[in-house]
Design a protein with these regions (language model features):
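PLP-dependent aminotransferase class I/II
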Residues: 10, 37-44, 49-53, 127-131, ...
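N-terminal "arm"/small-domain region of PLP-dependent enzymes with the aminotransferase-like
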Residues: 1-32, 37, 349
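Conserved active-site segment immediately N-terminal to the catalytic lysine
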Residues: 156-191, 206, 218-223
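Phosphate-binding glycine-rich loop
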Residues: 32-79, 93-97, 103, 169
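A short alpha/beta connector and helix-capping loop motif
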Residues: 111-120, 168-178, 360-361, 366-368
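Structural detector of well-ordered beta-strand residues that form the stable sheet scaffold
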Residues: 56, 81, 102, 154-155, ...
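Short beta-strand-to-turn element immediately C-terminal to the catalytic PLP-Schiff-base lysine
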Residues: 180-181, 195-200, 240
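PLP-dependent aminotransferase-like
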Residues: 70-158, 165
Length: 376
């Protein structure tokens, strides 16, 4: 039976096998593992790509958010407004600094709605933190204006947003800081965990650079409390290679998304991600291709029988319904758009191993499912 996996991690290795193996030998032969030149070069190259002043490699995306919030002084008694359509890590990072995550509903793009965010502002609010999900930016012009008007920090969880733009600005560069994840499933992933923080604030960058290394400054003197959250030099070396090929990867992901759009766009049973044409402020990079589907669970089972891997994000449960976390349910009002979305959401395969024939097979299988369903 034909197999089209949702993830294809071996495919990433096989694509660059010779180069990855050479990088491993080079870094190991130099014994260059922690805070070495490969990390410094990666930070410089990524900053150049994003047109941002500072990039700091850290242990993972959750650490990146935690360090950024901590550096801004957000803590006990404070509130941070986020979208409920996000990974639990976003809320966890806020809890880790002692603050409270406050959920505001999503808009038609299933990203943080500026109007909903405005309705959740209180005297305790310190920041607005949109998640740039699936490779698409939220309405950053409106969110930035909302933050400025209310004297709030604007910070970004851009774990899934590397390369996405709103207007001429990249995800992760709109506010005080933005964060990235290099988890293997991300747009450029490493062989394990990794993350980064982006900022244009010199003082904030200096503080976070010390905080990621036990509070030590550039000469090794401990100047503040910190933690161990350094992106390994070996991972940075791998990521430098991935970054070199990132533009071609984005082009291919957009081609796959366009093929899905053309093949599935006439199915009334499905809702597809918005397309970003030249008139749109969005430039999407499609980390995931998340749609909505009638008879979602039956469709997913049918595709599985066809050898097609799919995924329901966060296990089909938005963060505000994670009962064991005790966020304070009285603050989880007016999230109906999110709840409706999670009843129908489904992610189709979107990885760099997909061929056009693979995509067409997915399209044909979905079309076949609805054709059979409509005849019953």
């Amino acid at each position: 039976m034909r197999k089209i996996p949702f993830f294809d991690y071996p495919g990433i290795y096989n694509r660059f096998k010779g180069e990855f193996d050479q990088i491993f030998q080079d870094v190991c032969s130099r014994g260059a593992f922690i805070l070495q030149k490969d990390l410094e070069k990666f930070e410089i190259e990524l900053a150049h790509f994003l047109n941002v002043k500072h990039v700091l490699g850290v242990a993972d995306g959750t650490n990146a958010m935690y360090l950024g919030l901590q550096a801004l002084g957000i803590g006990v008694g404070d509130e941070v407004i986020i979208s409920p359509h996000t990974y639990v890590a976003t809320a966890n990072a806020i809890q880790m600094v002692g603050a409270s995550p406050i959920f505001a509903d999503v808009d038609q793009n299933y990203l943080l709605c500026p109007t909903a965010a405005a309705s959740k502002i209180t005297k305790h609010t310190k920041a607005i933190m949109p998640t740039q999900l699936n490779g698409r930016c939220a309405d950053m012009v409106s969110l930035r204006a909302l933050a400025e008007d209310n004297k709030l920090f604007l910070v970004e969880d851009s774990a899934q947003g590397l390369g996405a733009r709103y207007g001429n600005e990249f995800a992760g560069t709109f506010g005080s800081f933005g964060t990235l994840s290099f988890y293997p499933a991300k747009l450029i992933g490493c062989f394990g965990d990794g993350g980064a923080i982006m900022t244009n604030d010199d003082g904030l960058a200096k503080k976070m650079r010390a905080m990621r290394d036990h509070g030590r400054d550039e000469v090794g003197k401990v100047t503040m409390w910190g933690m161990n959250s350094r992106l390994d030099n070996l991972q940075a070396a791998f990521l430098r290679l991935r970054l070199k090929h990132f533009d071609e990867d984005i082009d291919r992901r957009r081609e796959i998304a366009d093929r899905y759009q053309r093949g599935l766009g006439n199915l009334s049973e499905m809702g597809l991600p918005p397309s970003s044409d030249d008139s749109s402020p969005h430039f999407d990079v499609f980390q995931n291709y998340e749609c909505t589907a009638d008879h979602r669970d039956q469709l997913r089972s049918y595709l599985q029988d066809k050898g097609i891997g799919t995924l329901i994000q966060w296990g089909g449960v938005p963060v505000h319904h994670f009962d064991g976390l005790g966020y304070g349910k009285e603050k989880f009002t007016d999230l109906s758009n999110t709840d409706r979305f999670f009843e129908r959401c489904l992610m189709l395969p979107m990885n760099m191993s997909l061929t056009n024939d693979d995509v067409d097979y997915v399209i044909e299988s979905i079309t076949d499912f609805y054709s059979k369903s409509n005849k019953q």
